[in-house]
């Protein structure tokens, strides 16, 4: 899988984690001035999972194993327009016929260079929201709820331990 950090994009269209990123295929903690946290979180970004699936689908050294486990279904409702400068939340409804516990992980997939110098509400391309570890909570607030409650909707030039989440003041 390719790296998903966006401070110095690779040419594969998967630079979707602002700054040095936070997932396994990021450079979390390794890029002075671009870190949102000191270490990566133990999960893969959507783009990394897609890379692995694509690779496995195109090699012949594996064998298929039948599983009785069914894939879960999930829906996030209809698409809708979010006014500029507005905090929002995303909500999913998942169902698993095997009654397995479900976790949810909301990730922005926009690829583009996003570093501490250009991150902010006026950014036209790239992710303006970080990936956070999967949880059983099916609702994700953007920016995160403590920032919203403190009136911190727009973030520019984030630093280590900043939320790395902002509303957008431009049409995206």
Set out the residue ranges of the language-model regions.
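Extracellular (secreted or membrane-anchored) zinc-dependent metallopeptidases
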Residues: 1-170
């Amino acid at each position: 899988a390719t790296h998903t950090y966006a401070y110095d994009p690779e040419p594969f269209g998967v630079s979707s984690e602002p700054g040095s990123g936070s997932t396994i295929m990021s450079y979390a903690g390794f890029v002075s001035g671009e870190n949102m946290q000191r270490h990566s979180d133990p999960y893969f970004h959507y783009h990394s999972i897609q890379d692995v699936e694509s690779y496995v689908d195109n090699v012949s050294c594996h064998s298929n194993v039948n599983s009785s486990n069914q894939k879960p279904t999930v829906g996030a409702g209809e698409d809708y327009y979010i006014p500029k400068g507005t905090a929002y939340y995303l909500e999913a409804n998942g169902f698993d016929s095997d009654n397995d516990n479900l976790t949810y992980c909301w990730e922005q997939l926009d690829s583009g260079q996003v570093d501490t110098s250009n991150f902010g509400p006026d950014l036209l391309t790239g992710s303006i929201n970080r990936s956070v570890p999967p949880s059983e909570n099916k609702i994700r607030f953007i920016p995160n709820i403590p920032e919203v409650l403190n009136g911190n909707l727009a973030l520019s030039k984030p630093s280590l331990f900043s939320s790395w989440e902002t509303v957008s003041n431009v049409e995206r």
